[in-house]
A protein has these predicted regions:
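Catalytic cores and adjacent flexible loops of soluble metabolic enzymes
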Residues: 1-194
């Protein structure tokens, strides 16, 4: 509440609820959004920014709009869900949903054209989106760089990746620690040899 009172003194255009890991449940989102709405000045827009590690971005955005809060709501999205790792909420999905369910008038042919002309080559070059390794990081509450390391550097099978990720201690989950993950990988490799 103290944070929101300070935000009210600044009176920014918007305040965001952010799911950095991509594991926010609809129930938790509702709890945070309603608690924020009670304290946040009504002139401040409420924004939702989600990562799509567990494929929850779209359902959480729909749940956010369904709360029918009496303020301006913003949902952050990107074309084709472009974003680091598992990506973000796809603009094309949420705009189509808002057109169908809230009488919005987003120009879907234009959005699809942008996907073809501006985004598809980035996707081919860099890739992003659902990956079981990012899913596991979200499930275990870990920084997504752990998945990136296992995927790009170690190329571990999912079973071994899961074992390594489960071994990360609670106090080391929020920040990527390369020496920790390397030691855990060595430990798992040694166990599989025996």
């Amino acid at each position: 509440e103290k944070l929101l009172n300070n935000v009210n003194m600044i009176l920014p255009y918007a305040f965001s609820i952010v799911d950095s890991i991509g594991a926010l449940s609809a129930q938790s989102l509702e709890k945070y959004a309603l608690a924020t709405d009670r304290v946040l000045d009504s002139k401040i827009s409420l924004c939702l920014h989600t990562h799509n590690s567990m494929q929850l971005s779209f359902s959480n955005a729909c749940a956010f709009f369904a709360l029918n809060l009496k303020r301006n709501l913003i949902v952050d999205s990107s074309l084709y869900g472009m974003g680091r790792g598992a990506g973000n909420l796809p603009t094309e999905s949420i705009c189509d949903y808002l057109n169908q369910n809230y009488s919005k008038e987003y120009d879907m042919p234009l959005i699809y054209s942008l996907l073809d002309t501006c985004i598809s080559h980035f996707y081919k070059a860099f890739g992003w989106g659902f990956s079981l390794k990012y899913y596991l990081c979200a499930k275990f509450g870990l920084h997504p760089d752990y998945a990136l390391y296992l995927f790009k550097t170690k190329n571990l099978p999912l079973g071994l990746s899961s074992k390594v990720l489960r071994m990360i201690p609670d106090d080391r989950k929020d920040t990527f620690d390369i020496s920790l993950i390397e030691n855990l990988c060595k430990q798992v490799f040694e166990e599989t040899k025996n």
